[in-house]
A protein has these predicted regions:
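Phosphate-binding glycine-rich loop
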Residues: 1-10
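Hydrophobic/aromatic ligand-binding patch that stacks against planar heteroaromatic rings
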Residues: 3, 23-25, 85
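A short helix-loop-beta submotif of the ANL/AMP-binding
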Residues: 26-33
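Helix C-cap/helix->beta junction micro-motif
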Residues: 28, 88-89, 119
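Active-site phosphate-binding strand-loop segment of PLP-dependent enzymes
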Residues: 33, 38-105
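Conserved core segment of the aminotransferase class I/II
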Residues: 114-193, 203-205
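Conserved PLP-binding catalytic core of the aspartate aminotransferase-like
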Residues: 193-196, 211-215
Length: 215
């Protein structure tokens, strides 16, 4: 966000959201403008609410897919509507997809960047969630689409990168193995797998509490 925002610039952020996104926008001098993710509509983004909150100061839109904290997985149709809005208003798209490999019940995860080759998208992921090794603080961002639209942003990223003297070399050393080796995460998200069974247990336990419903 520091590479993108000037004081007073606005970024559309989902509500509810992973709070680090709101914090990042604020610390960079921007204003986080929250758009509704509606519980009554499977926690999907309210497209009309997004449209209403765009101003001449809006620089980008953040999506979290799969969403933290709601757990919603956005279908292709919803993502396409977001792309259409971003295209109309020339917005950058920041897509937090760190849970993209932890999708269960045969649902499909669609990366929004695949629907927006003409826009400038920044997609985020990392080993802590995708490979369930949270102790290794290593992640990445993928810049895709029309790089000309993100020229100033890319220059800002390069400047900020040059200010960092030390990377997490021990963690970086395992990236190749994690991405190219045996993908054990698939065993965790099917019936009998630890993540799947934990989800089932928590879902039942929450719904057994009077006045509480989990979806």
């Amino acid at each position: 966000m520091s590479a993108l925002l000037d004081n007073g610039d606005e970024v559309l952020v989902p509500a509810p959201d992973y709070p680090l996104w709101t914090a990042c926008v604020t610390l960079a001098g921007g204003t986080a403008v929250h758009y509704i993710c509606d519980e009554q509509s499977e926690w999907y983004p309210d497209i009309e609410d997004i449209k209403k909150k765009i101003t001449d100061k809006t620089k980008a839109i953040v999506i979290i897919n799969p969403n933290n904290p709601t757990g919603a997985l956005y279908p292709r149709e919803v993502l396409q509507q977001i792309v259409d809005v971003a295209r109309e208003h020339e917005l950058m798209i920041f897509s937090d997809e760190i849970y993209d490999r932890l999708v269960m019940d045969d649902y499909e995860h669609v990366s929004i960047a695949s629907l927006a080759p003409d826009l400038f998208c920044v997609t985020f992921s990392g080993l802590s969630k995708s490979h369930m090794i949270a102790g290794y603080r290593i992640g990445w961002m993928v810049l895709s689409g029309n790089k000309a639209l993100g020229k100033d942003y890319i220059e800002g990223l390069n400047m900020l990168s040059n200010m960092r003297l030390c990377s997490n070399v021990p963690a970086q050393s395992i990236v190749q193995t994690a991405l190219g080796g045996y993908q054990s995460v698939g065993e965790y998200i099917v019936p009998g797998g630890r993540i799947y069974e934990q989800r089932e247990y928590v879902y039942k336990a929450l719904n057994d509490i009077p006045g509480i419903s989990a979806v």
